[in-house]
């Protein structure tokens, strides 16, 4: 049995659904929301790589690497902001984030 594009798209759809459910079901914890966003980005990258492999074009794979780089930077900055916010406020609940001042 050969693994085709339908298998990759099925796994990607499952990852995307888990990410969306993670955002909607757990709106209280910012870390879970960030992890769910990363899961959604992973599913999008899997789609890029699957279609790029199917079409024999490298553009999708290069774009997936670009998205991974941006996602890593986003996660690092988001976690750094959360660490500073937790040190100042003592909580990382979503309700407390709206009191941040620029």
From Swiss-Prot:
Entry's Gene Ontology cellular component terms: NADH dehydrogenase complex; plasma membrane
InterPro entries linked to this entry: NADH_UbQ_OxRdtase_chain4L/K, NUOK/Mnh_C1-like
Location relative to the cell: Cell inner membrane
UniProt catalytic activity: a quinone + NADH + 5 H(+)(in) = a quinol + NAD(+) + 4 H(+)(out)
Function text: NDH-1 shuttles electrons from NADH, via FMN and iron-sulfur (Fe-S) centers, to quinones in the respiratory chain. The immediate electron acceptor for the enzyme in this species is believed to be ubiquinone. Couples the redox reaction to proton translocation (for every two electrons transferred, four hydrogen ions are translocated across the cytoplasmic membrane), and thus conserves the redox energy in a proton gradient.
Complexes and interactors: NDH-1 is composed of 14 different subunits. Subunits NuoA, H, J, K, L, M, N constitute the membrane sector of the complex.
Protein name stated in the entry: NADH-quinone oxidoreductase subunit K
Organism encoding this protein: Brucella anthropi (strain ATCC 49188 / DSM 6882 / CCUG 24695 / JCM 21032 / LMG 3331 / NBRC 15819 / NCTC 12168 / Alc 37) (Ochrobactrum anthropi)
Taxon lineage: Bacteria, Pseudomonadati, Pseudomonadota, Alphaproteobacteria, Hyphomicrobiales
Gene: nuoK
């Amino acid at each position: 049995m050969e693994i085709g594009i339908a298998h990759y798209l099925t796994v990607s759809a499952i990852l995307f659904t888990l990410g969306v459910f993670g955002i909607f079901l757990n709106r209280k914890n910012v870390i879970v929301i960030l992890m769910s966003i990363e899961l959604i980005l992973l599913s999008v990258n899997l789609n890029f790589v699957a279609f790029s492999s199917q079409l024999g074009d490298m553009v999708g794979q290069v774009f997936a690497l670009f998205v991974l780089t941006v996602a890593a930077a986003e996660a690092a900055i988001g976690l750094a902001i959360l660490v500073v916010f937790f040190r100042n406020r003592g909580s990382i609940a979503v309700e407390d984030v709206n009191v941040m001042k620029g």
